[in-house]
């Protein structure tokens, strides 16, 4: 519920949850509806929420989890699939690269591609930590950045 409220606040489209994965996209279904900056800000807020809940659970002696977030920007194929039960989904290299950003990241951090960095590098209130080129499974070496609030 908390993550859904965050993406709605930032005009980002929740695509689906699969197991422990939460997929969302900016610029869908209308490319003018939201931007790379919107999804970066949503990602930082989601990370903070999960961090707060983690701290609360650990203090209460309960199991807790961490969250890695990966972002990439680019074209996707979007559509509705299904015959009896319909679902909106997205596909393409951009989706795969975003998944590699997530898997190549670190818990509690928002990892972005060079493409996303180019779109948000001048957004006030953000700071970036270059990671250099990092090997990403099936993608080779990709330039990555961690993003934080300034």
Go through each PLM region and give its residues.
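Conserved phosphate-binding and hydrolysis motifs of nucleotide-dependent enzymes
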Residues: 19, 74
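A short pre-motif secondary-structure segment
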Residues: 14-17
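Cytochrome P450 core scaffold surrounding the K-helix E-X-X-R motif
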Residues: 80-82
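Alpha-helical scaffold within the catalytic cores of cyclic-nucleotide enzymes
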Residues: 1-12, 28-69, 73, 93-106, ...
